[in-house]
Curated annotation (Swiss-Prot):
Residue positions binding heme b b562: 78, 178
Name under which the protein is recorded: Cytochrome b
GO cellular component: mitochondrial inner membrane
Organism classification: Eukaryota, Metazoa, Spiralia, Lophotrochozoa, Mollusca
InterPro entries associated with the record: Cyt_b/b6_C, Cyt_b/b6_C_sf, Cyt_b/b6_N, Cytb/b6-like_sf, Cytochrome_b_N_euk/bac, Di-haem_cyt_TM
Function: Component of the ubiquinol-cytochrome c reductase complex (complex III or cytochrome b-c1 complex) that is part of the mitochondrial respiratory chain. The b-c1 complex mediates electron transfer from ubiquinol to cytochrome c. Contributes to the generation of a proton gradient across the mitochondrial membrane that is then used for ATP synthesis.
Gene name for this UniProt entry: MT-CYB
Origin: domain of life: Eukaryota
GO biological process, one term: mitochondrial electron transport, ubiquinol to cytochrome c
Record text on subunit structure and interactions: The main subunits of complex b-c1 are: cytochrome b, cytochrome c1 and the Rieske protein.
Listed transmembrane segments: 28-48, 72-93, 109-129, 174-194, 222-243, 285-305, 317-337, 344-364
């Protein structure tokens, strides 16, 4: 290993100066990296036995679960690991919003947004691969949303499908991209890490103080390893042994039948908030735009660069707005799993409007509090 590369690795993982007062919320990024590595490894093992053929895909999944030694554990680890990955990713994003990392490190925030989008795309592609009833119809419904694009919509849908319906060509494309995208995510994660360590990590005070810092190793490496051990215990003992497929939709275990449409089509739980927003808008193109903005709005947070950073812990209004926003996320997730009927339809629209309004109010409130403090200090 070249000396320069060795120095970069040691600086990034061992000798990095880290604030002494960071809490467990700052460990989530490292846990996400470990989970990403685990997902890549389990995915490679699954790909050794998976058959991307419409006539035998579902049978190959049954073969993995029944005949391959430890195959059931590998598949359960991969499926439940994806759920845990998104749990931690949402917590990681929430920590960044709460402590306003988008102001302190805007470039790192934007690259992290790319990681989030690529992770969502990878998870959606993987959801289709078992070729169950919900997988097939989920792919049909979600990809058909591209038809809302003016002029190019129908051509885009045909291009994604590879034909005039979801078929063998679609499965081949989804399998190829699901295998490749995690490595693209890995590249963006490394860029995210380099940008983060370029300026140093923030702290619960909401600043970039360089006064009190310690070496990342051994003070924080052991802490991360202990949390990762607890995470593995939760994943394998509770999710893989006790509740093997509790987070999966039951219709996923029924082989795909293009002639029978499920009464209720829904994605995985970590996409339900966006799915509820999609269904809340009566217009198809309006729903697609709202669906896209429910994720892309994260890129607007660095627009608050005109203000200084201040932790939400010192902003009571910001705390109310932040936890209100978290409540909206959970409510929309619940509504996304509910059938399309009253009163769920009437509840979804106002919650969707609030979902887009509250983040803007949060950023405005933070800027207002900061300017108020600056004004009071100027009076002294």
């Amino acid at each position: 290993m070249a000396p320069s590369l060795k120095k970069i690795v040691l600086w990034s993982f061992l000798a990095l100066p880290s604030p002494v007062n960071i809490s467990i919320w700052w460990n989530i990024g490292s846990l996400l990296g470990l989970l990403l590595a685990m997902q890549i490894m389990t995915g490679i093992f699954l790909s050794l036995h998976y058959t991307p053929m419409m006539v035998s895909t579902f049978s190959s999944m049954v073969h993995i679960m029944r005949d391959v030694p430890g195959g059931w554990l590998v598949r359960a680890s991969h499926a439940n690991g994806a759920s845990m990955f998104f749990m931690l990713m949402y917590a990681h994003i929430g920590r960044g919003v709460y402590y306003q990392s988008y102001i302190l490190q805007p470039r790192t925030w934007l690259v992290g947004g790319n990681d989030f989008l690529l992770s969502m795309a990878t998870a959606f592609l993987g959801y289709v691969l078992p070729w169950g009833q919900m997988s097939y119809w989920g792919a049909t419904v979600i990809t058909n949303l591209l038809s809302a694009v003016p002029y190019l919509g129908d051509s885009l849908v045909t291009w994604v499908w590879g034909c005039f319906s979801v078929n063998q060509a679609t499965l081949n494309r989804f399998y190829s991209f699901h295998f490749l995208l995690p490595f693209v995510i890995l590249v963006f994660v490394l860029v995210h890490l380099l940008l983060l360590h370029d300026k140093g990590s923030s702290n619960p005070l909401g600043n970039m103080s360089h006064v009190s810092k310690v070496s990342f190793h051994p003070y924080f490496t052991w802490k991360i390893l202990w949390v990762f051990v607890l995470l593995c215990f939760l994943l394998y003992v509770l999710l893989c042994y006790i509740t093997l497929m509790y987070l999966r939709t039951p219709k996923t275990f029924i082989e795909a039948n293009p002639m029978v449409t499920p009464t209720h089509i829904q994605p995985e739980w970590y996409f339900l908030f966006a799915y509820a927003i999609l269904r809340a808008i009566p217009s198809k193109i309006g729903g697609v735009v709202a669906l896209a903005m429910s994720v892309l709005y994260l890129y607007t947070f660095p627009l608050a660069l005109y203000s200084s950073a201040a932790a939400t812990a010192y902003n009571f209004i910001g705390q109310l707005l932040f936890w209100g926003y978290v409540s909206l996320f959970f409510l929309l997730t619940w509504l996304g799993a509910c059938p399309v009927e009253e009163p769920y339809i009437s509840l979804a629209l106002p919650l969707t409007v609030m979902f887009f309004v509250v983040p803007g109010l949060y950023m405005i409130s933070s800027s207002y509090i900061i300017r108020s403090f600056q004004f009071l200090l100027s009076l002294k």
